[in-house]
Amino acid sequence: MSQEKNISELSFEEALKKLEEIVRRLESGDTTLEDSIQMYSQGDALKKQCEARLKAAQKKIEQISLDQDGRATGTSPFDAE
């Protein structure tokens, strides 16, 4: 099974944890150049996976619309911008 397939099967939390570990190892400076390049590549794939999971979750979020008295009147799609 390829690295890309493994990453795509990770939950957001698992991918984020792996990404944080890679960042920690890269920041420590205790890796070879080849290992650093490989970890950077894996980290980039993990970052993209996390972003994709967040965007998918954001599309599912709805905002509750309130009237002037504060009563719920319905929902509308979440707009982050």
UniProtKB/Swiss-Prot annotation:
GO terms for biological process: DNA catabolic process. It catalyses: Exonucleolytic cleavage in either 5'- to 3'- or 3'- to 5'-direction to yield nucleoside 5'-phosphates. It comes from the Bacteria. Disulfide bonds: none annotated. The keyword Secreted does not apply. Its main location: cytoplasm. Coiled coil: none annotated. Keywords: Cytoplasm, Exonuclease, Hydrolase, Nuclease. GO terms for cellular component: cytosol; exodeoxyribonuclease VII complex. One of its GO terms (molecular function) is exodeoxyribonuclease VII activity. Its EC number is 3.1.11.6. It is found in: Cytoplasm. InterPro entries: Exonuc_VII_S, Exonuc_VII_ssu_sf. Gene3D superfamilies: Exonuclease VII, small subunit. Bidirectionally degrades single-stranded DNA into large acid-insoluble oligonucleotides, which are then degraded further into small acid-soluble oligonucleotides. Belongs to the XseB family. Heterooligomer composed of large and small subunits. This is Exodeoxyribonuclease 7 small subunit. It comes from Zymomonas mobilis subsp. mobilis (strain ATCC 31821 / ZM4 / CP4). The lineage of its organism: Bacteria, Pseudomonadati, Pseudomonadota, Alphaproteobacteria, Sphingomonadales. The gene is xseB.
